[in-house]
């Protein structure tokens, strides 16, 4: 191997190491505009986080039983000088595209006397852009709204609402790249991973992902969520995993919702109780909902060993009241 070959490989490695990724989520996300003097008050009564015209938030919409209907980001409009415009009563709600119809019905069901309008923004007009592995904050030209994604405590991911023409012309990654990045960091998203009317917000890590304000006023589904946080026990959580020997047999099949099993050591009885289930998977990485009592156990799915990464939520595991009850 000559010096040129070595240098070429180093340059290629350096480029991969220091590049950042960006993806236009036009095909998977929808934007809803909520505008009017009661826009904040209206959304405040439906969401788990505190809504203001000052800061974007990650949040959830619950049903009356305290189960998640939708996970979402809510953005205030950015003024022309790049700051949040406090004079505007306009908020943008990012929602998964497959949930768009149900979400609009949900909002309109509760929008009885509120002085605000609710409308879908055409996908040809505005789109969500995500950028990650960035060393410093940067915004695209003509950014309409902007947020540092609070779910990633150890990584930096930026979200912004931009004209669709700008969004699609400047992408350097794919939706699969975005999914892999989320999975490696233990971040569930959308109705395929946070199952509507089934998932609980704490089991889905919405508190760890800074999507719940436990000190705000009343909102739909609040009672069970707050009671569980302060007095109950959250027995299951979502964690990232990898398939250690994936390269040896990439055709191994693991599907979402498949149950986990415990790999019993020689001489030990096999537990009949499933320790959890697969939430999502792409290649060798994925997310699993796991009972906390089995975090130190050797786990498998369909006979295929998986390896949890609990370190991603180590601080949250040690400091969350519900886990220490």
Curated annotation (Swiss-Prot):
Family designation: Belongs to the GcvT family. CAF17/IBA57 subfamily.
Q: Where is the transit peptide?
A: 1-21
Q: Signal peptide span per the entry?
A: none
* SUPFAM superfamilies from the UniProt entry: Folate-binding domain
Alphabetized InterPro entries for the sequence: TrmE/GcvT_dom1, YgfZ/GcvT, YgfZ/GcvT_CS
Organism phylogeny: Eukaryota, Fungi, Dikarya, Ascomycota, Taphrinomycotina
Named from the GO MF annotations, one term is: transferase activity
Q: One Pfam family this chain carries?
A: Beta-barrel_CAF17_C
What GO cellular component entries does it have? mitochondrial [4Fe-4S] assembly complex; mitochondrial matrix; mitochondrion
Q: Which residues form a coiled coil?
A: none
Protein's gene: iba57
What Gene3D superfamilies has UniProt attached to this entry? Probable tRNA modification gtpase trme, domain 1
Keywords, ordered alphabetically = Mitochondrion, Transit peptide
Q: Which GO terms describe its biological process?
A: [4Fe-4S] cluster assembly; iron-sulfur cluster assembly
Name-wise, this protein is Iron-sulfur cluster assembly factor IBA57, mitochondrial
- Name where it's found: Mitochondrion matrix
């Amino acid at each position: 191997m000559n010096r040129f070959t070595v240098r070429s490989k180093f340059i290629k490695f350096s480029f991969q190491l220091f590049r950042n990724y960006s993806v236009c989520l036009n095909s998977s996300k929808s934007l809803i505009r909520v505008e009017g003097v009661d826009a904040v008050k209206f959304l405040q009564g439906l969401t788990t986080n505190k809504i203001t015209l000052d800061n974007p938030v990650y949040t959830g919409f619950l049903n009356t039983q305290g189960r998640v209907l939708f996970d979402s980001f809510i953005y205030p409009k950015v003024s022309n000088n790049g700051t949040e415009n406090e004079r505007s009563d306009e908020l943008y709600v990012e929602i998964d595209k497959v949930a768009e119809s149900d979400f609009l019905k949900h909002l309109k069901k509760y929008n009885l006397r509120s002085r605000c309008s609710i409308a879908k923004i055409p996908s040809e007009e505005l789109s969500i852009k995500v950028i990650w592995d960035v060393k410093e904050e940067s915004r695209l030209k003509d950014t309409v709204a902007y947020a540092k994604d609070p779910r990633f405590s150890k990584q930096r991911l930026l979200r912004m609402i931009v004209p669709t023409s700008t969004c699609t012309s400047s992408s350097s990654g794919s939706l699969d790249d975005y999914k892999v990045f989320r999975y490696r960091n233990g971040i569930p998203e959308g109705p395929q991973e946070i199952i509507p009317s089934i998932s609980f917000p704490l089991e889905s890590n919405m508190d760890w992902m800074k999507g719940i304000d436990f000190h705000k006023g009343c909102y739909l589904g609040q009672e069970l969520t707050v009671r569980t946080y302060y007095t109950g026990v959250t027995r299951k959580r979502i964690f990232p995993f990898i398939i250690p020997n994936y390269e040896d047999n990439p055709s191994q099949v693991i599907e979402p919702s498949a149950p986990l099993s415990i790999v019993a050591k020689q001489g030990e009885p096999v537990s009949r109780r499933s320790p959890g289930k697969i939430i999502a998977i792409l290649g060798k990485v994925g997310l699993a909902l796991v009972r906390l009592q089995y975090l130190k156990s050797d786990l498998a799915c369909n006979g295929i060993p998986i390896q949890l990464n609990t370190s991603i939520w180590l601080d949250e595991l040690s400091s969350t009241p519900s886990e220490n009850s």
